[in-house]
């Protein structure tokens, strides 16, 4: 790789460069828009689902031919928890494949300089060695509860690689660890563990309960990254010099980069931390009759380390920030 990989290029993200962020209302997409605006980018393209149905090829074609963005961030996806993935696998694989295919294909056909595709750590095998390296992709069976979604995301990675090979494009995939932050989903039936814990402890505190029940033994280890750090990493990559960015696309096998903290925490430690930040004074009860899930999920972030980027927001500060946002959102209800 070239020596200047750690030097962001301001001209790559000049104020007037036209950047299309697909999925700007989601947790990650909204954070990327905030980060780009903070960097001084003032020519951002966003569209709601009502304005642009990304599953409709004709609409996507018309949009790209009319607007002709220079950079595309593909953060749009159909997402959901274990229940939704198990009940509607056909929708998850179809809608994600269509969104990715339409955007990647028409990006190439309209001469897009750079595209950043956001995947998910669920692309890695269920029993992957820890920490999970990018090279472990397709080295074993997937987690069956969300394999339709994972296969769609893997197809997106392979589509970017194929277009790079055939059309000499510069389409790069990034795989985030578990994300959290302002704008997260706090629905207890659909949310992930961290926002669910925030809500549980808050509601227990407000109602004067003496205990909060947490599923499992508390021993599984998980990695968490604040969504603003994820956005900063994406913008950092998009701002790399043209030669450095192209070097990544050409040399990385597979052509993807993990983005995470590089360290994990047990669910028990996480629960204790959330309890402290929320101010709940009762006990934590671990329901050991409930499943634990995978013992550990930690990303290897060596590739991002080599590029000179590291996450800045500590888990404690990030949870406090997220809880503050949650309190404001609750007050609006």
Language-model-detected regions and their locations in the chain:
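NAD(P)H cofactor-binding loop motif with strongest signal on the N-terminal glycine-rich segment
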Residues: 24
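Adenosine-cofactor binding site in Rossmann-like domains, unifying the SAM/SAH pocket
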Residues: 37-62
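NAD(P)H-binding glycine-rich loop region in Rossmannoid oxidoreductase-like domains
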Residues: 57-97, 109, 126
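Conserved Rossmann-fold NAD(P)-dependent oxidoreductase catalytic core, especially the SDR/UDP-sugar
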Residues: 101-146, 172
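Active-site helix of classical SDR
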Residues: 148, 152-155
């Amino acid at each position: 790789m070239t020596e200047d990989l750690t030097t962001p290029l301001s001209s790559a993200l000049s104020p007037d460069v036209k950047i299309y962020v697909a999925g700007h209302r989601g947790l990650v997409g909204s954070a990327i828009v905030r980060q780009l605006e903070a960097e001084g980018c003032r020519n951002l393209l966003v569209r709601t689902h009502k304005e642009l149905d990304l599953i409709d090829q004709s609409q996507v074609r018309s949009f790209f031919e009319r607007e002709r963005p220079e950079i595309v961030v593909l953060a749009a996806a159909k997402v959901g928890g274990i229940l939704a993935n198990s009940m509607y696998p056909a929708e998850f694989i179809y809608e994600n494949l269509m969104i990715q295919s339409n955007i990647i294909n028409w990006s190439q056909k309209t001469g897009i300089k750079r595209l950043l595709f956001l995947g998910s750590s669920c692309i890695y095998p269920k029993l992957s060695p820890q920490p999970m390296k990018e090279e472990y992709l397709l080295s074993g069976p997937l987690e069956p509860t969300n394999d339709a979604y994972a296969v769609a995301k893997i197809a997106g990675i392979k589509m970017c690689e194929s277009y790079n090979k055939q059309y000499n494009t510069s389409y790069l995939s990034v795989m985030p660890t578990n994300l959290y932050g302002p704008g997260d989903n706090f629905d207890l039936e659909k949310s992930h563990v961290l926002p669910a814990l925030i809500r549980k402890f808050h509601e227990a505190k407000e109602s004067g309960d003496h205990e909060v029940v947490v599923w499992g033994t508390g021993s599984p280890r998980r990695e968490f990254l604040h969504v603003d750090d994820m956005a900063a990493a994406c913008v950092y990559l998009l701002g790399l010099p043209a030669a450095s960015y192209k070097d990544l696309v050409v040399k990385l096998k597979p052509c993807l980069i993990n983005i995470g903290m590089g360290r994990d925490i047990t669910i028990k430690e996480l629960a204790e931390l959330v309890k402290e930040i929320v101010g709940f004074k009762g006990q934590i009860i671990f329901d050991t009759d409930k499943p634990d899930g995978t013992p550990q999920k930690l990303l290897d972030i060596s590739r991002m380390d080599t590029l000179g980027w590291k996450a800045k927001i500590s888990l404690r500060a990030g949870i406090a920030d997220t809880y503050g946002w949650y309190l404001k959102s609750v007050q609006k209800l």
